[in-house]
Amino acid sequence: LVQTEEYAKRFIELGADAEKVYIVGNIKYDAVTTEVDFRKRNRLRTSLDIPSDGKIIVFGSLRDGDEKVAKKIWDELKEKYSDLWFILAPRHPDKKDIILNHFDSKDVLLRSENLKGKKNQGERIIIVDTLGELIQFYSIATVAIIGGTWFPGVDGHNPLEPAGLGVVPIFGPYMRNFQEPADRLLKDNGAIQLSDYNELSSILERLFASPYESINYGTRARKIILQNQGAVLKTINFLARCISK
């Protein structure tokens, strides 16, 4: 059982019987959330005092060095867009202090404090120092930036999570751990890959200036996810046939 035609070709080239190589797809697609209830999305926006027409950048799974990328983006865009909110979700919530050190505290609201009742007092940077909420934040995003992709060493995080929710994922050159889904999204124009984080602000400005472009990217991204789901069922059916023989 293999994920793609490319993998099938490789096994056959190595000597496998072509009639015994089956393409079932990538089970990672089956685990992707493709819808979050609009009431949950509205409650999340309301809890953070983000208007329905606010521009939201979600920078997910930040790793070492990504906080500098986030700071650069914020410094370049905060004055240009008064309706911009920047949501930063570190891969490890206990690293929030590293992020905090790069921003003015008066601009930052911690999600943990927000959940305890602290209201937004005009902060436009939200640090998600909680677990299990990234998908919800992706669901209200205008665009998503994938952490761990801008510097060598981590080799990427999952671009399928925002893609499944119709949000365009933007990632850097280091995607080895998620190369297949990244390539598939890029092939069908459902994601944006940049060679350098210095390009981020300009691409974000382009997407903000043309909302339909980001919407179309997101629509294509979600379609790619839906088209590639079903690998788990194919695998189970194949194994069931093998067992019954």
Q: Model segments located where?
A:
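Nucleotide-activated sugar donor-binding and catalytic core shared by glycosyltransferases
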Residues: 1-245
